[in-house]
C-alpha cells in the first residue's frame, strides 16, 4: 500500500524538475539578451554614428527576445534598451538627450523607458498573433514592427512632452517644420528607414535561426 501511495508523488518529481529546468533556461536566455543589449549600447556595435545621423541597432535584440521568448520578455528587453538610453543621456553620450534631460528629467525618463517597454511587448504580441497562420512571414513582420513601434512611440512621447520647448522649436525651425507631423518626418527621415531595414533583415534572420536551433 505504501508503494501505491508513493507512486503519484514520485511521478510528479520529474515533471517538477523539468518545469524548474525550463524556467531556469528561460531566465538564462533572457539574461543573455539583456547582456547583449548593454554590450551593444556601450560599444560601437549598438550605434552607427555619422556627422548627421545616429542609427541604433538595439531594436534587433529587443525584437529577437520578443519573438523567441514572448511579449513579457520583449518588454523586459525593451526596458533594458530604455535604461541604456537614459544612462547615455545622463552621462552626456547623446547631446540631444542630455539637453532634454536638463529641460525635464521625469519626462525624458518616461520617453526613454515607456515607449521601449511597449515596443518589445507589442512586438511579442504581434508575433504570437501571426505565428499560427503565417509561420515564416511572422518573423519578418514582427521584426519590422519593432523599429517602427520604437520610432512612433518615442516620437509621440517627444512631441507630447518637449515639442513646445524652445529647444525643440528651434530644431523644428531649422528643419523648416511648421507642424509636429512634419517635424517627425523630417527629424526621423532616412535614419528611421535604415533602422527599420536593419532590424527587419538582421532580426528576422537571427530569430528564425535561433528558433530552429531551439526547436521552437
Could you say what each language-model-derived stretch is?
Residues 1-216:
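Loop-helix junctions at membrane interfaces
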Amino acid at each position: 500500500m505504501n508503494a501505491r501511495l508513493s507512486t503519484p508523488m514520485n511521478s510528479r518529481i520529474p515533471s517538477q524538475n523539468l518545469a524548474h529546468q525550463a524556467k531556469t533556461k528561460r531566465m538564462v536566455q533572457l539574461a543573455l539578451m539583456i547582456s547583449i543589449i548593454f554590450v551593444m549600447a556601450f560599444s560601437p556595435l549598438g550605434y552607427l554614428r555619422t556627422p548627421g545621423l545616429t542609427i541604433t541597432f538595439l531594436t534587433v535584440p529587443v525584437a529577437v527576445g520578443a519573438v523567441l521568448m514572448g511579449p513579457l520578455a520583449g518588454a523586459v528587453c525593451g526596458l533594458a534598451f530604455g535604461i541604456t538610453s537614459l544612462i547615455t543621456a545622463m552621462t552626456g553620450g547623446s547631446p540631444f538627450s542630455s539637453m532634454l534631460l536638463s529641460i525635464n528629467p521625469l519626462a525624458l525618463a518616461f520617453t526613454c523607458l515607456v515607449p521601449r517597454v511597449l515596443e518589445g511587448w507589442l512586438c511579442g504580441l504581434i508575433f504570437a498573433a501571426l505565428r499560427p497562420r503565417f509561420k515564416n512571414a511572422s518573423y519578418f513582420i514582427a521584426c519590422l514592427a519593432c523599429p517602427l513601434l520604437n520610432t512612433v512611440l518615442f516620437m509621440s512621447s517627444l512631441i507630447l512632452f518637449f515639442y513646445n520647448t524652445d529647444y525643440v522649436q528651434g530644431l523644428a525651425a531649422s528643419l523648416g517644420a511648421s507642424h509636429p507631423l512634419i517635424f517627425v518626418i523630417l527629424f526621423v527621415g532616412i535614419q528611421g528607414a535604415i533602422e527599420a531595414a536593419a532590424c527587419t533583415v538582421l532580426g528576422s534572420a537571427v530569430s528564425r535561426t535561433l528558433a530552429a536551433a531551439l526547436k521552437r
